[in-house]
Amino acid sequence: MGTRLPKPANGAVFKRLPEGGVLFSTEDEVYFGVGIVGARIWELLPPATSTVEEMVDILSAQYRDVSAAQIREDVDRFLKELQTNGLVSAVATDPAGT
């Protein structure tokens, strides 16, 4: 089992644009612009994928000129930014550690 992905927050609205996308927090009433890769990461959040590893595999197949390690680092950083801005929910931890 891999690292579970956070889910989009209930108050997060996403609009795809040719150059990436825009996220809107209905709670904070703030817009966030994201690039093409950020938009793709957003689109791969649950229910599209359930783990970070699954997301990295998909992105690695799309961006073959970037190492999986670099993609993982970028995904982790972007997910932290989304969480900091309240655009994704925190991942619930399983007390059994699974």
Residue ranges and their predicted role:
Residues E27-T98:
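Long, charge-rich, low-complexity alpha-helical segments
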Residues M1-E29:
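Long, low-complexity, charged/polar intrinsically disordered regions in eukaryotic proteins
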